[in-house]
Amino acid sequence: METRPRLGATCLLGFSFLLLVISSDGHNGLGKGFGDHIHWRTLEDGKKEAAASGLPLMVIIHKSWCGACKALKPKFAESTEISELSHNFVMVNLEDEEEPKDEDFSPDGGYIPRILFLDPSGKVHPEIINENGNPSYKYFYVSAEQVVQGMKEAQERLTGDAFRKKHLEDEL
């Protein structure tokens, strides 16, 4: 008689575990496959943080079903250099329906994935492109090395004295 309650409890525990495994695809956090060790924000929270901190934003726009997006995810997530550089940005990860409708976020088309860089005021800087990529898809990155290069360029252009001087000239 004692085996029935144990069997029932074991079955319930096994079923609960199975549900947990099925419902979890490993991308539940804001990282969505691009690395949960990176401090990701929503676009709204990211813009607020950038305005308060003076850090530029790096925005990744991708789709859950996209093959090129899936190929970039592990390269991005496993790059120690991207992880280190991410501390100099407010990192925003937009998937599927989170993609903004604003045309500023698709300067040369709506292909995916796209990586865009915004200044601390939230303005997209379309001049920061993947220099080593396809000129028809300027914001499409296929390797961690390309992303690192874009991050370094954005950091140089959107932070420090060079950015402040350019920003001041624009206001005058």
From Swiss-Prot:
Gene3D superfamilies: Glutaredoxin. It comes from Homo sapiens. It is found in: Endoplasmic reticulum lumen. Optimum pH is 6.5. This is Thioredoxin domain-containing protein 12. Widely expressed. One of its GO terms (biological process) is negative regulation of endoplasmic reticulum stress-induced intrinsic apoptotic signaling pathway. Pfam families: Thioredoxin_7 (PF13899). InterPro entries: AGR/TXD, ERp19, Thioredoxin-like_sf, Thioredoxin_CS, Thioredoxin_domain. The keyword Electron transport does not apply. The keyword DNA damage does not apply.
